[in-house]
Curated annotation (Swiss-Prot):
Transcription is among the record's keywords: no
Organism of origin: Bordetella avium (strain 197N)
Full protein name: Beta-ketoacyl-[acyl-carrier-protein] synthase III
This protein's pathway: Lipid metabolism; fatty acid biosynthesis
NCBIfam families: fabH, PRK09352.1
Molecular function terms from GO: 3-oxoacyl-[acyl-carrier-protein] synthase activity; beta-ketoacyl-acyl-carrier-protein synthase III activity
PANTHER family: 3-OXOACYL-[ACYL-CARRIER-PROTEIN] SYNTHASE 3, BETA-KETOACYL-[ACYL-CARRIER-PROTEIN] SYNTHASE III
Domain of life: Bacteria
Enzyme Commission numbers on file: 2.3.1.180
Annotated family: Belongs to the thiolase-like superfamily. FabH family.
Subcellular location: Cytoplasm
Function, in words: Catalyzes the condensation reaction of fatty acid synthesis by the addition to an acyl acceptor of two carbons from malonyl-ACP. Catalyzes the first condensation reaction which initiates fatty acid synthesis and may therefore play a role in governing the total rate of fatty acid production. Possesses both acetoacetyl-ACP synthase and acetyl transacylase activities. Its substrate specificity determines the biosynthesis of branched-chain and/or straight-chain of fatty acids.
Catalytic residues (positions): C122, H255, N285
Gene name, Swiss-Prot/TrEMBL: fabH
Domain notes: The last Arg residue of the ACP-binding site is essential for the weak association between ACP/AcpP and FabH.
Amino acid sequence: MSMAIKYSVIAGSGSYLPERVVSNDELAVELAQRGIQTSDEWIVERTGIRQRHLAERGVTTSVLATEAARRAMADAGVGPADLDLIIVATSTPDFVFPSTACLVQANLGAKGGAAFDVQAVCSGFAYALTTADSFVRAGRVRCALVIGAEVFSSILDWNDRSTCVLFGDGAGAVVIKAADEPGILAAQLHADGSQTKILCAAGNVAYGQVTGDPFLRMDGQAVFKQAVTVLDRSARDVCAEAGMTIDQVDWLVPHQANVRILNFLARKLNVSADRVVVTVDQHANTSAASVPLALDAARRDGRIKPGQHVLMQGVGGGFTWGSVLARM
């Protein structure tokens, strides 16, 4: 592989959502049967979420990831033989091992390239995209498939109103290719392991038994405070790394956690609401899938145009966060 390659560009995107759409009203009815009280008004007021897509039982992360991958590959005009690298960002893999990326590779009929998962929860796509970009810049690969995919409904405690209304399932993907001109301009990844307990799913499988608490648990107020602080700083730092300012960014594509975080972040960055891609109302929080889902939606509806600058940001359990600035 030539070492002269210096840059990577996003050549295509794709996404996939499970067919089942559950509105807040429908979810409220289901939860009422468990003795949990909520309503569309309660959920929208606190989160901005109006509906979510939920996978049927038995539909795994690799299924969603594969379909998103196929759509991204079609958009980029590449086939399985072109893929030198597949990275899947997920916190809900099909198995302990093999990796979800290897399952996707098999589903696509791709052979021989590297395939592995990364796990940084809702920051996962930023971590995966930055990793793939580094492989391309190093001249190790010419074409990489990067996927964020989750079946978060499988790790929710449906008796916990504070979390079960927030999340959905889905997958988004991009294809990046080697290029002579920069597409991905700058990226930064960070973590603070001292904050593990504010957002976690602390269960495990050991000796044939599930140990610990297998469900997602969250301190919502702590997550909000941490998220808006680190995302603000990260956005400014990654723009500075690229020799740009926030004003020069055409689109902000943040992790779709809830509308309150998105609005607060936009105000801190002095970014107008019409420059922020928002899909959380339709998708809910899809963890590692949220950023590529939002990116693909905005590319396909014509909002994001070639040549525009897009700032993608993730933040999640760990505590982790990351930003990627790209010219489309």
